[in-house]
């Protein structure tokens, strides 16, 4: 069984990012290592939840131009994570391909549906009522999720079914995504490409 591990370095005039992802943490067999430091506390919290509940190990460090705002850091971290995810998946053989999940957090309930398709698309409904959650702009939540989807080459739909607390709305969305990813990338035991086209890695 081949390892699904990948690293990405992303450097621009706005950010410097290193990201390593291991898609196959096995409880009781391998140690799940998660270390996220983006300079944005709430973003760290969301990416940590994504890795934890997605069954992944994740090392993600970023130094960005936060003296301007959170846009470049949040967007570029999501792009790097998506690139590493796509690289780790490789030829996308022997996986379920589709994943879906619901995740509650108190009064909030979110749904995520993903297709590991090489057809980047993103739809989202997260009705935030505040400008920020912690030090992350709420408008960046959907934007960074879109950035991840396009960099990873996946179709992604995320919806808040209900929720009042903005922290809970965001966190339940990330946890639903984590569980959907975990389903979609799970191995089937075969080596087939789950597509009538015969190829998914484009």
Curated annotation (Swiss-Prot):
InterPro entries linked: IGPD_sf, ImidazoleglycerolP_deHydtase, ImidazoleglycerP_deHydtase_CS, Ribosomal_Su5_D2-typ_SF
One annotated GO biological process: L-histidine biosynthetic process
Coiled coil (UniProt feature): none
Gene3D superfamilies membership: Imidazole glycerol phosphate dehydratase, domain 1
Pathway: Amino-acid biosynthesis; L-histidine biosynthesis; L-histidine from 5-phospho-alpha-D-ribose 1-diphosphate: step 6/9
Any one GO molecular-function label of the UniProt entry: imidazoleglycerol-phosphate dehydratase activity
Catalytic activity: D-erythro-1-(imidazol-4-yl)glycerol 3-phosphate = 3-(imidazol-4-yl)-2-oxopropyl phosphate + H2O
UniProt xrefs under CDD domains: IGPD
Its biological purpose: Imidazole glycerol-phosphate dehydratase required for histidine biosynthesis.
Subunit and interaction comment: Homotrimer.
Entry protein name: Imidazoleglycerol-phosphate dehydratase
